[in-house]
């Protein structure tokens, strides 16, 4: 199992109070495979440097998790299929 940091940029039309529960549905993939979600940090609505899908704002969320590489790949695939997710960025902070 490896430590990952996932940043998710969500559509600004989504209500901010429903962000964490909706992300929790996707994170069940990690939990079912034996991984753990350490922290979900919702940064809230912020202005984008450039428009994405004609949106000038987005809701940022950062998630720290421990999971297998295959599980994280499936999580990223599911997030990219969701139309409320504008962008995702997955990094391993301890990989240097």
UniProtKB/Swiss-Prot annotation:
The keyword Hydrolase does not apply. GO terms for molecular function: small ribosomal subunit rRNA binding; structural constituent of ribosome. Gene3D superfamilies: 3.30.70.60. Keywords: Ribonucleoprotein, Ribosomal protein, RNA-binding, rRNA-binding. One of its GO terms (cellular component) is cytoplasm. InterPro entries: Ribosomal_bS6, Ribosomal_bS6_CS, Ribosomal_bS6_sf, Ribosomal_S6_plastid/chlpt, Transl_elong_EF1B/ribsomal_bS6. CDD domains: bS6. One of its GO terms (biological process) is translation. It holds the Pfam family Ribosomal_S6. Belongs to the bacterial ribosomal protein bS6 family. Binds together with bS18 to 16S ribosomal RNA. PANTHER family: MITOCHONDRIAL 28S RIBOSOMAL PROTEIN S6 (PTHR21011), SMALL RIBOSOMAL SUBUNIT PROTEIN BS6M (PTHR21011:SF1). This is Small ribosomal subunit protein bS6. It comes from Acidothermus cellulolyticus (strain ATCC 43068 / DSM 8971 / 11B).
């Amino acid at each position: 199992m490896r430590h990952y940091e996932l940043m998710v940029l969500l559509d600004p039309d989504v209500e901010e109070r429903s962000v964490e529960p909706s992300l929790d549905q996707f994170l069940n993939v990690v939990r079912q495979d034996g991984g753990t979600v350490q922290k979900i940090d919702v940064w809230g609505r912020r202005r984008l440097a450039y428009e994405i899908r004609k949106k000038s704002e987005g809701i940022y969320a950062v998630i720290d998790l421990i999971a297998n590489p295959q599980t994280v790949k499936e999580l990223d695939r599911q997030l990219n299929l969701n139309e409320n997710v504008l962008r995702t960025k997955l990094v391993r902070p301890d990989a240097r």
